[in-house]
Amino acid sequence: MKKSKLDNSSSQIRFGLVQFLLVVLLFYFLCMSFEIPFIFRTGSGSGSDDVSSSSFADALPRPMVVGGGSREANWVVGEEEEADPHRHFKDPGRVQLRLPERKMREFKSVSEIFVNESFFDNGGFSDEFSIFHKTAKHAISMGRKMWDGLDSGLIKPDKAPVKTRIEKCPDMVSVSESEFVNRSRILVLPCGLTLGSHITVVATPHWAHVEKDGDKTAMVSQFMMELQGLKAVDGEDPPRILHFNPRIKGDWSGRPVIEQNTCYRMQWGSGLRCDGRESSDDEEYVDGEVKCERWKRDDDDGGNNGDDFDESKKTWWLNRLMGRRKKMITHDWDYPFAEGKLFVLTLRAGMEGYHISVNGRHITSFPYRTGFVLEDATGLAVKGNIDVHSVYAASLPSTNPSFAPQKHLEMQRIWKAPSLPQKPVELFIGILSAGNHFAERMAVRKSWMQQKLVRSSKVVARFFVALHARKEVNVDLKKEAEYFGDIVIVPYMDHYDLVVLKTVAICEYGVNTVAAKYVMKCDDDTFVRVDAVIQEAEKVKGRESLYIGNINFNHKPLRTGKWAVTFEEWPEEYYPPYANGPGYILSYDVAKFIVDDFEQKRLRLFKMEDVSMGMWVEKFNETRPVAVVHSLKFCQFGCIEDYFTAHYQSPRQMICMWDKLQRLGKPQCCNMR
């Protein structure tokens, strides 16, 4: 009996021990099931995030709630937003689950929103048979083939040694009348100009002819002489480094005048107009010369015999008493150009600007503009109502500058993009760029992309580039994208009418890859004050959906001319309110609405991307109100005081503006003297 009891007791102990071990094992697996996600979650937030968070707080004048481990610490989402499928911001947990996908996209550097051209085949788009969609399908098809060849290595740079074509730099270039006409009235300056270079043009203006403007007629005689940057960028109109336009007859004032200016990407700068009055004493001189000399004017008071001439004599006596040396006008000079009368014009490159003399007399001086240098002036064009007899260029540079666009790339680690953060960012900036805009992208990297917010990855900026028609450009573009890590290639053949596809890709990246609170679009010739842009967005009360920029209201499409829009493309009389394309901001929910509509083939696509954005925001506004904020500081035409963005800035102007922002601590333009 005792033995039996002992056996029973020992068996019960063994059974209890097994149960205990099973409970411990179950508890162990239970702990591990909770521990593993915790380990991954804590491991995803590195110490660098904390450091960058403090630098972000230091960069802005007022605190901004970013970072932290809870949903409320990242985006404060109210109940109203919670119920709205388009409004809610992604919480960190969901974003972290997407991290592997995000990293893969980052390494690929290719937008995947346009899988292939068949995306436009399955219907759904209301205007699927339009010219736009046919153009898009063809561009995506060709782009995919080009990219597949690049990605697979089938398209490679030529391995055969290329004989470097060293262009000679002659000290002097001259052409006769017939040669000039045969060369399309352009004199090529192989190595540009240098200090002291001078060009002489011998020509005769035509007699005035009748031109009609509607019901009005006018007698017109004018010509244009331009220094052009012929080697700036292929496929674009060359920048006009100096535009010299004498109007003998036909100016709106009714008097002969001389207009001077510069033009970059079809955007004119601030002009200099000489109308016969000498520049005032308070205007700056150019190498000691006045900007505009005086000549006789056909005024009612008899030109120089009137009050103006008396005033000039008084000024001369006053300057003499004060010890200031300034010559007095002793001759009644005529306007330097006349119909049917031969002239000899000389253009000279000085220390501070260009100086133009006619028949040995100084006429005008034009100060250099920040965006251009003398070596950029590789062509002289003379067009209009004029016969050119000969052109001479002398004292030209002896060295040959490299005009290869790739020379602007500086393969240094300092210019590489920081890695993507592990949590949503405050602002994503998508920058539209063309494949061969190597200099523009490098200037952006060296200027406003060095801002503390960008370097700390609180703000992420990426270039969105379509494929170029030339394969060698695409090969260099792929290398650039792989090295710097800041280029997203949108795989279609670039076309001006398809820029809107890049805009959709920007929204998709901002929503799905970085989950940005705000999404901004700008161009590669736009200078952005990143901190000011965020502050402007944060001014919107509450957590409203927003659309911020330089808003156009009640604009009508142009039906004639170069930028004409057909009724098939846009049947409505007016465009919706839209922000100018060089710089605008969207809230996350608006960007997500655009991406969702595109993926579901409900998005109407129009060739003008800024108008398209206004149209999409208007549609979103039908279901949820959008705070539309208009500000002229998102400058469309050049640069203004206290700008948020400045458009049409050349690479040199971008570097200049960044230098001023760093040294002075405040924004200052670089396109005015």
Swiss-Prot record:
Coiled coil: none
Glycosylation sites: N116, N182, N621
Ranges in the topological domain labelled Lumenal: 41-673
Domain Galectin as annotated: residue spans: 185-394
Topology in the lipid bilayer: Single-pass type II membrane protein
GO CC terms of this entry: Golgi apparatus; Golgi membrane
Recorded superkingdom: Eukaryota
Residue ranges of the TM segments: 20-40
Gene3D superfamilies: 2.60.120.200, 3.90.550.50
Subcellular location: Golgi apparatus membrane
Tissue-specific expression: Expressed in stems, cauline leaves and siliques.
Function per UniProt: Possesses hydroxyproline O-galactosyltransferase activity. Transfers galactose from UDP-galactose to hydroxyproline residues in the arabinogalactan proteins (AGPs). Is specific for AGPs containing non-contiguous peptidyl hydroxyproline residues. Utilizes UDP-galactose solely as sugar donor. The addition of galactose onto the peptidyl hydroxyproline residues in AGP core proteins represents the first committed step in arabinogalactan polysaccharide addition. AGP glycans play essential roles in both vegetative and reproductive plant growth.
Name assigned to this protein: Hydroxyproline O-galactosyltransferase GALT4
Species for this entry: Arabidopsis thaliana
